């Protein structure tokens, strides 16, 4: 669906190591000096979903295809990025194109890896990044306000937009992000956001990069990040990027055994991918045939014809009905035939809102 998650953080927090592990590549050079990521590294990542494997156990398809999310490793920034310091201009331009921000925060002690501020202070790091996002939004908004003031005489819409923009600027100048702006659901704000893509309005996932010894019991640094995320009504993940990067070279069975030895069911990166998918407001439905079992990505709240259109636009144009089985019923009755026999196969029309996990077969005519 062309949706992307931008990975950000100060230099040397483990951002590129996180990206390397996420993408199961070594694309982003991981080095102990600032700005080793200058051009954004991009990669398409499978979204872990154990339901696909369960469906495949029943259907025995030739192949399994996952939903995917694009991750973008964006160059580290420093204080003053909004004014072009460091690689600030590149950073801000690249992050504007992302729908969700994954903020990696250093929560590990290691004298061999320098910190840009010479000390480990995760809340200060978070404040630095989020302040730069707000300052960048102010700079962007100032330019739009100038254009709106010039358009007042010739445009009827300019007045409402200008009032909203000025109110938002006051809010931002109080160092509050756009996501807490009281009018952020108004038509005027949404129009401004669609055009300007305010950085401080984007959803944020906080990733505490901890040492291996702190995976099961969070250290004080990570606890501070977790509490901050909770206060922001944002998601939080703790992981050891170095460890996750090392797992890239392991087989699936080795990874499973290794995670069991750590006392966890899934890696921090698997959780990160899932949460990113969730924060994008996406759900999955499935198609299950002998050729392939496949996960399809749609926005939550999509109708059956819209879901069909993800496969092919002709499916949406000529939509007749959707033969629907819930995932739980498909598994419980061991496939389509069993579900049909038990009366669990439903015929849904164009007004049906597809649910996460639906197994669908579309009928259409063009």
Question: Model features per residue range: what roles?
Answer:
Residues 22, 84-87, 116-119, 219-222, ...:
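Short, glycine/charged-enriched secondary-structure capping and boundary segments
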Residues 77-82, 118, 127-133, 152-157, ...:
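Flexible beta-alpha connector loops of hexameric P-loop NTPases
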Residues 1-114, 123, 142-143, 148:
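Conserved G1/Walker A P-loop phosphate-binding module
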Residues 96, 100-103, 108-136, 140-143, ...:
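Switch/coupling subdomain of P-loop NTPase systems
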Residues 2-8, 13, 19, 147-353, ...:
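C-terminal-of-GTPase-core extension/linker across diverse P-loop GTPases
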Residues 33, 86, 121, 153-160:
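A structural signal for alpha-helical segments
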Residues 25, 51-52, 76-78, 106-112, ...:
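Conserved nucleotide-binding/hydrolysis micro-motifs of P-loop NTPases
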